[in-house]
C-alpha cells in the first residue's frame, strides 16, 4: 500500500494523499446516506451505511486511503455519558464530569461496546481495494475530556482549564481512564482490519505549553508507545492541532506527525522532519478556487519534495467545498509528485 509505505518513509511512486473529513457534506452521496440513517449518530452506528460513507471518497476522489467513518465521541458515549447531536450546534452531553465521583462512575470497558465500529472496519476492509489503506482513529484523552467536562464544544475551555489548575488530580484520573480505553479501542480497530491509526488532538491549542505537554502530549505518548509495542507494523499518526509553537518539545514513539495549516511546514520539517514523516497541510479554503489550490500545492511540494510526506489538508474539508476541486487536488498531487 502506497500510503503505508509512505508512513514508514519507504519509496513510493508518488506522494499519497487523503483528506481529513473526506467523507462529508460536500458529497451528495454522503448526504443521501445520512438521510437514510436518520441522524448523524445513527449513521455512525449503522455499519452498512458507515461503510458506504467510508468508501465514497475513495471511489469518487481517488484518494490513497479511506478513513473510518465514525466520531471521536462514541467512546465517552459508551462510557455512560448520554450524547446528542443538535443540528447547527453540534455534540452535547446531557451529563458532565465535575468531580472525582463522576470520573469513578464512568463505565470501564467501553471499547467492548463498540462493535458497530469494528463491524464497519471489517466490512470496509473487505470492499476496499487491496492497494488502498484504511485508517482507524480516536480523539486524544485531552480533547475527549474537554467535551466531557464542558458538555459541548467551547471557545474558552474555562471548566476544563479550571479543573486542570485547581483540581489536577480529577483531570488526571479522567485522562488516565480515557487512555486505557483508547489503547484497547485502537487495538480492536487494528484487529478488525485498519492498516494505520490516527489520534486527533483537536483542542491541543487550548493549553499553554507546559500544561499541554503534561496534560495532553504525555498521554498521547503513552498510547502510541503501547500501540507500537503491540503492533510495530501499524503506523501511528498524531495530529495535535495548533501547537506549532511547541514543536521543539515533540517526541515519542510514533510514525507520522500531522501538521495543521497554521504551522509553517518549513518549521515542522526543520524540527521534526528528520524523525517523523509529515502529513499536511493545505489550507482547506484554498479548495474554493483552483488557482489558490495550485499555488498552495506548489508551496507545500517545494518544501517537502517527494519524500517523508503524506499530502493532506491542514484541517477538515468544509461542507460547501466544490467536489470537482477536491478531485482535481488528488490528480494534481499525484501528477506533480510522480517519480
From Swiss-Prot:
Which pathway does it serve? Porphyrin-containing compound metabolism; protoporphyrin-IX biosynthesis; coproporphyrinogen-III from 5-aminolevulinate: step 4/4
Q: What domain of life does the UniProt record list for this protein's source?
A: Bacteria
Which keywords are on file for this protein? Answer: Cytoplasm, Decarboxylase, Lyase, Porphyrin biosynthesis
Q: Where in the cell is it found?
A: Cytoplasm
Q: Give me the reactions it catalyses.
A: uroporphyrinogen III + 4 H(+) = coproporphyrinogen III + 4 CO2
Binding-site list for substrate: 21-25, 71, 147, 202, 315
InterPro entries (UniProt xref): UROD/MetE-like_sf (IPR038071), Uroporphyrinogen_deCO2ase_HemE (IPR006361), Uroporphyrinogen_deCOase (IPR000257)
The record's principal subcellular location, in a coarse class, is: cytoplasm
Keyword Cytoplasm carried by entry: yes
User: Where does the record place the site Transition state stabilizer?
Assistant: 71
Which EC numbers does the record give? 4.1.1.37
SUPFAM superfamilies assigned: UROD/MetE-like
What are its GO biological-process terms? protoporphyrinogen IX biosynthetic process from glutamate
PROSITE patterns in alphabetical order: UROD_1 (PS00906), UROD_2 (PS00907)
Gene Ontology MF term list: uroporphyrinogen decarboxylase activity
Cross-referenced HAMAP family, in alphabetical order?
URO_D
Protein family (similarity comment) = Belongs to the uroporphyrinogen decarboxylase family.
Describe the subunit structure.
Homodimer.
Write down the PANTHER family for this protein, in alphabetical order. Answer: METHYLTETRAHYDROFOLATE:HOMOCYSTEINE METHYLTRANSFERASE RELATED, UROPORPHYRINOGEN DECARBOXYLASE
> What is the documented function of this protein?
Catalyzes the decarboxylation of four acetate groups of uroporphyrinogen-III to yield coproporphyrinogen-III.
Its name, as the record gives it, is Uroporphyrinogen decarboxylase
Source organism of the structure: Helicobacter pylori (strain HPAG1)
| Gene for this chain | hemE
